[in-house]
Amino acid sequence: VQGPEARELAAPCIDESHREQALQLKPFTGMDSSQSFVARTGYTGEDGFEIMLPAAVAPSVWDRLLAAGVAPCGLGARDTLRLEAAMNLYGTDMDESISPLEAGLGWTVAWEPADRDFIGRGPMETLRDDPGKRRFVGLLLEDKGVLRNHQRVVVEGKADGEITSGGFSPTIGRSIALARVAAGDYDSAQVDVRGKLLNVRIVKPPFVRNGKTRIEL
C-alpha cells in the first residue's frame, strides 16, 4: 500500500494491538504482529507499508483496503513509479555482471575502514578509480516519442550506451529512462528510436520522489 495517505488508510487493517507501533515505524524498518509482518518499505519512491499475511485472511484485508478508498494498481503502474524513482530492476538495470559502481549503487558499498575486506574489493577499487568506467544516468526526452529498454544511446555520432529502463512519466509529462553510458563530461545525447535519432538531456536521477518532480524541466 503506497502513496501519501497509504499508512493512514492501511492502519485500520493492522491488528489493533500493533497498530500504533506500525504507525511509528521508521522508513526501512518492520515489525511482527500476531498474524502479519508490516514494513515501512516499498518499491515506488512513495511512503507506505508492505504487509505480509496468511493467505486465508488476505481477501478480507483486500476488501477492507478497497472500502477505505485504496485504489488497486497493476504491475505497469508499479513499474512506472519505480522508474520515476530511479529504482533498479534486477535483470533489467543490473545483474551479477554489473558492478554497483556502474548501476548507480556506489552508495551501498562500505569502503571504510580502509582495511575492511569483502569479496570483490580489489576489482571494485580498480573500477572506482577508473576514469573510463560507465555512468548510470537518467535521460529526459526533449522530442516527441517514448524511450524504451535496449534503445541505443548515441553521443557525438557514436553508439556509446544503452537504455536499461524507459517509459512515459505521468508525473513529469515526458518520456524518461535510465541508461548506462560511456564515461565523459556531456549533458546531452541522442537515442536511436526506430532508426530516428531523438534528443535527450542527461539528468541525475531520481526523476520523482514522494510525488514531486526532482529535475528541472
Residue ranges of each PLM-predicted region?
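Conserved, structured C-terminal
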Residues: 1-217
